[in-house]
Amino acid sequence: LPTTWRPGPPLGCSAGNRMMQSPPITQEITVEEMERYKQATAEMCANLQVCGFDSLLFHFGHSIPVAQFLSPLTDRRTDQYGGSTENRCRYLVEILDACREATRGRMTFEVRMSATEFAEGGIDLEEGIRIASILQDHCDIIQASCGMITEKYMTWTHPCQHMGYHPNLWLAEAFKKSGKIHKPVTAVGGLESLQAAEDAIAEGKCDFFAVARQLIADPETIKKAIDGRADDVVPCIKCMRCHDSTVYGHHFQCSVNPTAGLENSIAHLVQPVERVKK
């Protein structure tokens, strides 16, 4: 939640929550401040629509501040926004509805959420399915991520080399098999290959597979696939250099794509190869 509107501690769903990996420092946001944030978000969506965007991803997962409303571990409010699953979903539903109205229903909304936080007292898979079943009526796609951005639980949020490929696919599959989710479900995290995504979709485990790091490793991944050159795709090795390089204040870096983060500054130095790949 924004911290620039007022001095003092950052605002959170409840007092004493962590902001990502910070100490427990948040101050409980008031209903009036929640309304301001909701309207600002709706205005932002309308502006993005004017700029030409036709789809938006709402990040309601990983225990980032706004996502903390969903979890019984971090939502300790005693008003209409705390307690039951429905109450904990209420504010995010209001945000989605306000954004839908601001964009006149002409944008696709995808909601990213933690299907489970893996934390004791937090969202488990059963609760994640209940939350998704509520949010789905206010968006178009549900993305089944997991974990929390804290030292103990972010391993699943950003799966790295030692976890194997697409370790969180089972969560999207659980959503699909629950019989309670009627909107398309996106899987995310550590994709092995485009063929693996095709197989997961064909087997009914998910409807989409979201990628981010793969497009850093090879920005032409999708184009190569369309052109029938999937074997030429440079795979992401899940080393987390892209994540760590920015966290520690370096320019954006990738272990398998040396041009990542430097595209504009070194474009004039990259010359066509003299001999093309056979």
Q: What feature does the model see in each segment?
A:
Residues 1-278:
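Flavin-dependent oxidoreductase catalytic cores
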